[in-house]
Amino acid sequence: ASMSGDDGYMTRYSRTAKDESSPEVPLTTIVAKLKAKGLKLGVYDSPFWYHYTNPNAVIPGTDGIKVSSLAYDPAKDKDIKHPGSKDQFGWVVTDHPGAEQYFEGFFKHYSDLGVKFVRMDFLSWYEDGMNYTDVIDKGYGRERYVKGMQWINKYAQKYGVYVSLVMPHLRNNALIERYAGNMVRIDADALEGSWYRFSDNNRGSLRGGWPNSENAFDGFINWSKISGRKKIRLDGDFIRIGSYADDNEKMSVISLPLMAGGPISITDMPTGNDLKFFQNDEMLALNKDGFVGQPLERNLWNTDGEIWYGQMKDGSWVIGLFNRDQAAATRSIDLTKVGITGTWSARDLWKHADEGTVSDKIEAVIPAHGCK
């Protein structure tokens, strides 16, 4: 795919058809087609990247500063982490003149197009050039990274753009990412999907840099420490529903992001029986409510990390019992431990069935990789 434009910002995108040689299409055309269907366009782009076919394009709001001047200059940019490494992208060096105006122009450009969602990737490569211990890129340093994040916060708010941050190191408990973004990735890429990527891959291991967790379940448990209503949303990456072995796994991969307050990001084309997992209105009501749950304990091995709870705006409580194990197992929660007292009517949100009343305790046998 190619992302290109004549003024330093993306105005055209290729690969809009299943054809390697499909022509570039103006974003305005894509926006119009989606609008006719009642849909909105989100883009994959970053103000840390520059796109140009015209290096002499002038940055908006500057006195003739060219977009090409934002690029790395070995003659003056001396404090780079890995100067001998090859840049994987055209990075904007944020202490170059015109960089802030370029960032503002980025958000204005998309806002003017009617694009209100931007997903920004490879942030760790900009900050220090690293994938945990592997050197990938030059790395422009924490100071330049923080400066760019401050501008993202400032101008995304000014132009009403929702910011999705991908591949950050999340240092200092995601201090700068919580400030700058609306949503943040908390685990390694879903890649081919499957329960292995969702729950088993390197389970129980936390790192100090990207990716902090190798599976989404660990990521949601660990980073629940920064989530909550009107706080940054946790993004467990895309859902390849067709990669899961059975209905139990499919219900779990939909339920956990919703219990954690995260998005449901459809990746493959759900057909036949798989479509229903994305159409459960009772589960999707959590997303509409702004619900954000928490695990009983932020523990990657103890079953308390598999029991989630939270409260809806109407005062009702949602309990999620999960089973990461290879065999059926009992999961239970003492309701008084989370401040729930009295007798409550119970309903199964996947079966769409009332289940009488509960008080004091909820307990159920959960199938392998399943939930309730």
Where do the PLM segments sit?
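Short alpha-helix capping/helix-loop boundary micro-motifs
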Residues: T357-K361
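Aromatic- and glycine-enriched glycan-recognition loops and surfaces
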Residues: A1-K66, P97-Y102, E143-Q150
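Active-site cleft segment of glycoside hydrolase catalytic domains centered on the general acid/base Glu
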Residues: T94, Y126-I152
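Active-site-proximal substrate-binding groove within the catalytic cores of carbohydrate-active enzymes
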Residues: N153-H352, E363-K372
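Loop/turn elements at helix/coil->beta-strand transitions in domains of secreted/extracellular proteins
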Residues: K35-G42, L113-V118, Q157-Y162, G315-S316
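Short acidic catalytic loops
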Residues: A1, V43-D45, F106-I136, V163, ...
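Active-site-adjacent "subsite" loops/lids of carbohydrate-active enzymes
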Residues: P47-L113, F122-S124
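Solvent-exposed loop/turn segments at secondary-structure junctions
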Residues: S2, P47-H51, F122-E127, P168-R171, ...
